[in-house]
Amino acid sequence: MKYGETVFGEFIERPNRFIAKVRLRNTGEIETVHVKNTGRCRELLIPGAEVALAKADNPDRKTAYDLIAVVKANLGGADCGPGWVNIDSQAPNRLVREWLEGGGFPDGRLTEIKPEYSFGNSRIDFYCEAEGRRDNPSETRKILIEVKGCTLEIDGQGYFPDAPSQRAVKHLRELAKAASEGYECYIAYTITMPGISSVKPNVATHPQYGEAIREAMDAGVRILFLECETKPDRLCISRCTKLISVETMRRSDAYTIANITPSKELMFRAGRSIFEAVCWRAPVAIAAGKGNNAGDGYVVAKLLRDSGVDCRIFLLDERRFSEDGGHYFEICRREGIPYEEFTEETDLSEYGTILDCLLGTGFTGDVRGMAGSAIREINRCGSLGAYVVSADINSGLNGDTGEGSTFVRSDLTVSIGDFKYGHFTGKADEAMKARINCDIGIEII
């Protein structure tokens, strides 16, 4: 998305939410300009800030320019440099429409795109239709997308909204209702500033919005983070990150297994994805729990052995396995991969890499017993220099909220299928130095 003629100036003041006084750089004259955002923008529109102005198309308009972007000092945190923030409130919808029409949508090819779609008592930004799923290609999928522009950044984290918005709460509740009626629903946060990759609800300013987004996520509404390449005169979506709930992933996993891909094959793909994503430092310790998360680790162990990398499996309970996990553990056992039960005396300090497969995204509550001891040992060794990798999500974190009192601190977290909300909420940033997502062919429904 590109603006026409653009000039630069210095922000002086904002007499009201519609206009601002700006000193033009090229002439030194003070010009009254239209502000294309009625939000507060208090942390952006400060005296002396550099701004970008787009020339108005209508020569008879009272204001000759629109204020569309502003330079924010320390964008991303106190140690960061300045960066442009686009504050044009009309830009996100234009940008997302271009992105959709250009094939950017991450969940299939769209066959129809309609803006301003009426649903319930709201107008949702986009109604789309898409081709059916692999097992039912004749089906028409109905999709609703509500776009929100994010211009509020605090210490490298994006937040929405920047002011209380009952309209935004209403949209979330309508989307939750639509999801219950069979629509695929998305909130698309368009992040119109560089270096910011995610958005959190601004509960300090609007607690009700935080409650509404939680209810929407529980209903199956998905989240898109649309990162932008931001210049004073143009915007371009450069990256899309999709988030879903743990329940959506559970349902999608079951659907895929029943209709498309056998469960053992999916587990092998998950383990192979983790294996291929990591630069392994030998020897490798694999800390395995009791569920399918552990099964991914057993696949990794087999692939490491095939590649000549020494590894050892540490089991929370060598008597309990999921069905598919037990299948791959038996392969490891037959091939002579060493294993032992994790105890209070277990010392992992000799290992170059530790793979955390203790608890998966379905974990809720508090970590107890030997799992807590294993997490503390992994973190101790991580602080001594071991490279720590978490499979799907860091053990101890809730997959939906990202909260937890005892959790693994990883150098890398390898998400499987799609990112879950817990990868970007709660204590996720504290737990994960880096995170990547691997698509293994799960059909998200």
Residue ranges and their predicted role:
Residues E29-L44:
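Beta-strand/loop nucleic-acid-binding surfaces
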Residues R42, A78-P115, R134:
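Acidic-basic catalytic patches of nuclease active cores, encompassing PD-(D/E)XK
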Residues T192-R239, K420:
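Domain-level recognition of nuclease-like catalytic cores that cleave nucleotide substrates
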Residues R234-T256, G352-I445:
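YjeF_N-associated NAD(P)HX repair module
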Residues C240-V284:
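An N-terminal, well-structured beta->alpha segment
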